[in-house]
Amino acid sequence: MTQPSEIKRRDFLKYAGMALAASSLAGAAFAASGERVEQNKVFEKSFRASAPYRDPFNDVEFKVRITFPDGREQTYPGYWAGGDVFKFRFSSHELGEFSYVTLSSNPSDAGLHQQRGTFRVVRYEGDNALLKHGPIRVSADKRHFTHLDGTPFLWLGDTWWCGLAKRLRWPDEFKLMTKDRAEKGFNAIQFTVGLAPTGTYFDRKNENENGLPWDEAAQRINPAYFDAADLRVFHLVDSGLVPVVVPTWGFYILRMGTVNAKKLWQYVMARWGALPAVWCLAGEISMPYYTSATPAEDGPRQIAAWSEVLAHLREINCYGHMISAHPKFGTSARAEVENPALLDFDMIQSGHIFMQALPRALTLLRQSRSAAPAMPVLMDEVAYEGIAETNWEDAQRQLFWASVLSGSPGFTYGAHGITQFSSDEFPSNVQPQGLSWGEDTWQNAYQYRGSTQVGIGRKALAELEWWRMEPHPEWVLPAKSENMKAFTSYAAGVPGRLRVIYFSALSAMELTVLGLEPEVSYEAYFIVPSNGKRLPVGTVRGNREGVWSVTRTRKHDLVLVMVAT
């Protein structure tokens, strides 16, 4: 009879898409010479402790030292997998022969200490961009993202704060969502690891099939939670979607303490660091718990505690994955940590009512781009589609174009109903203080038109040299009033080579481009941002003042693309 643990292992092998190596002989050399794994895929090895431990998670530390083909060495954390089993995972973009030796804080444990083996990393031959080009990094100019091999990466994220919870069932519902997002053009998914912003502390509605990730009574990890989570997270990667890992919401730090928060991060690093992941320190770093009796004191305490954890995360970040932090309402990650230089890129949160959120988001974006140290800036939480029964697709496409044409290397979308994966069976749209932001379910929300239309925008930009573009607000007429400034038009490009301009429905009937170079001709076309349709314009040159204009024949928003000939 097949045992439940065997079912999970079989499914893990079926769905994860990893190169796994296993041995049933404790204390032997677990890896035989000649094992192979494709570049950027995960090599995993399992070991059994030969010594008894009352509390394996807290009583023993397990690591592995990897020797690269050029002889350099790097140590990586291993992890407790439950019972007496410990594992390590590893991946590399480099090709060649690697060797490893395991290290235990208990040197007398022959099952965990000084186990040796070799394996070979071979070229990946598939078409998954994350495996072909490698994990995501900050570009040399500190303004956009690239893959490890330098290929530009135009970020389009989606927000699944409760995406690992069992109310988004594995495999059918999770795979439905993943397929939908990949087809629409998304390439990153941000999610919490069970300790989500919805519900009370350690709320059981955020469990997966195996419970919560953290056993508060025992002060340790629940490895079985991560067994179920692995299926989902590896499937994201297999589908070309970057896992943006947010282990916990900010207010948990006062409940768990910094020591346990560091241990949680080290465990996440050990299990998912070999994936092309992005690390987000925590969600809404300084936001107090909803019903806290001491909110004024909690925020500064949370910033101090998470700043300590950030320094630790930077220290143990053995794969060099990008690190950011998700800020509370109305600010950026720079303001949520004591040393912003430890962040690789900035995230901003500007609120959820479009007419207020867009101007605030643009202000935060410009402030961060002008601050030191330089780093890319993402609108990471802004005016979720459908939240408060507002912010529909017209708002979403304007947020996208406002973001990318104002200097951001992408955009993170969100839809109310999806962020918490509320359903009729598992309603989760009411916060602990009693506030509801809307009634819709994820089964409806994933079909909101805004998710399609931001994907249309990303696909259109991906055909251009978007990573060379800089904001150029001087290329369009200024708004007639300060109130309209954030809502009319945005322009970016490369002088003399490329211009991309968004004209909203509030722009004038006469669409005008300024500052055209006298010696340059452009081939121009409009994009209808709601459906991607192209409307040819033809050859464009400025007049003696460098001005060109055309009377619009469509009152809806339009994107003008001008490519030098």
Predicted regions and their residues:
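Catalytic-core region of carbohydrate-active enzymes that cleave or remodel glycosidic bonds
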Residues: P340-E425
